[in-house]
C-alpha cells in the first residue's frame, strides 16, 4: 500500500 501517496493526497486536499 502507498500510505505516503494517500497522506500526500489528503494533505494536498486540505
UniProtKB/Swiss-Prot annotation:
Gene Ontology terms for molecular function: toxin activity
GO cellular component: extracellular region; membrane; other organism cell membrane
Disulfide bonds: none
Modified residues (Leucine amide): 14
Tissue specificity as recorded in UniProt: Expressed by the venom gland.
Keywords: Amidation, Antibiotic, Antimicrobial, G-protein coupled receptor impairing toxin, Immunity, Innate immunity, Mast cell degranulation, Membrane, Secreted, Target cell membrane, Target membrane, Toxin
A GO BP entry: defense response to bacterium
Subcellular location, record wording: Secreted; Target cell membrane
Similarity annotation: Belongs to the MCD family. Mastoparan subfamily.
Function: Linear cationic alpha-helical peptide that acts as antimicrobial peptide. Has antibacterial activities against both Gram-positive and Gram-negative strains. Has no activity against the yeast C.albicans. Shows moderate mast cell degranulation, as well as leishmanicidal activities (IC(50)=36 uM). Has no hemolytic activity. Its mast cell degranulation activity may be related to the activation of G-protein coupled receptors in mast cells as well as interaction with other proteins located in cell endosomal membranes in the mast cells.
The protein's name: Eumenine mastoparan-EM1
Organism: Eumenes micado
